[in-house]
């Protein structure tokens, strides 16, 4: 899953929850309506959920609170430790978007929040192909992540971040693999999914991809 970012996850584990709470000005808009975004994923998820990039367990906790059956996949030991320290049940397993243990149930939904951009477009295609083979008809993928309408919109946000002095945000936008909606839609459709996209703030969209018959 772009494990080149693993050291970043380990470093970020202690402060991640402060960031998503809006305490970091550079990422305030990225995480605006964070709790609403998580609730929307939970609302769209089925009963048996495979979650990638569990992180500190915020989405995991929301899914469990809604009585979902959850199998979490997370590559960072520090992130998993932070989740367990918050009292979240240990449903976490080592792995990533591309390499992960099989859950003990047949998932009807695959979810992720703020993580799919760690894969290149080619890796995204590989991952979605794998998920297509896991899910039955009417199964779905629900991902929330930073994405852009097109490359021009992506570049505009980079320029805006630099103008505001948000150097870390600008660097993230330039170096990580944030998808464009048209590319992501094409990948899903080629793998047998119908998609809908829902904008949640200036950066984050939720994509809901349903597997066709």
Swiss-Prot record:
Coiled coil: none annotated. One of its GO terms (biological process) is methylation. The keyword Transferase applies. Its EC number is 2.1.1.-. GO terms for molecular function: S-adenosylmethionine-dependent methyltransferase activity. The keyword Nucleotide-binding does not apply. S-adenosyl-L-methionine binds at residues 53, 74, 96. It comes from the Bacteria. Pfam families: Methyltransf_25 (PF13649). It is an enzyme of class 2 (transferase). Keywords: Methyltransferase, S-adenosyl-L-methionine, Transferase. Could be a S-adenosyl-L-methionine-dependent methyltransferase. PANTHER family: TRANS-ACONITATE 2-METHYLTRANSFERASE (PTHR43861:SF1), TRANS-ACONITATE 2-METHYLTRANSFERASE-RELATED (PTHR43861). HAMAP family: Methyltr_YrrT. Belongs to the methyltransferase superfamily. YrrT family. This is Uncharacterized methyltransferase BPUM_2363. It comes from Bacillus pumilus (strain SAFR-032).
């Amino acid at each position: 899953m772009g494990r080149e970012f693993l050291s970043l996850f380990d470093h970020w584990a202690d402060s991640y929850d402060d960031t998503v709470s809006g305490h970091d000005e550079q990422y305030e808009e990225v995480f605006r309506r964070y709790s609403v975004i998580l609730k929307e994923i939970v609302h769209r998820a089925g009963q048996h959920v495979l979650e990638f990039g569990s992180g500190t367990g915020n989405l995991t906790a929301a899914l469990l609170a809604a009585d979902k059956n959850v199998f979490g996949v997370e590559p960072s030991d520090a992130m998993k430790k932070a989740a367990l320290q918050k009292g979240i049940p240990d449903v976490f397993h080592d792995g990533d978007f591309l390499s992960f243990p099989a859950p003990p149930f047949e998932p009807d939904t695959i979810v992720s929040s703020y993580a799919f951009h760690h894969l290149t477009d080619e890796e995204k295609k590989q991952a979605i192909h794998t998920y297509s083979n896991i899910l039955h008809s009417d199964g779905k993928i629900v991902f929330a992540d930073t994405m852009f309408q097109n490359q021009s919109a992506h570049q505009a946000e980079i320029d805006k971040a630099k103008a505001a002095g948000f150097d870390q945000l600008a660097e993230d936008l330039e170096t990580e693999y944030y998808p464009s909606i048209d590319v992501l839609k094409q990948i899903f459709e080629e793998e047998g999914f119908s998609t809908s996209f829902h904008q949640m703030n200036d950066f984050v969209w939720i994509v809901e991809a349903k597997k066709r018959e």
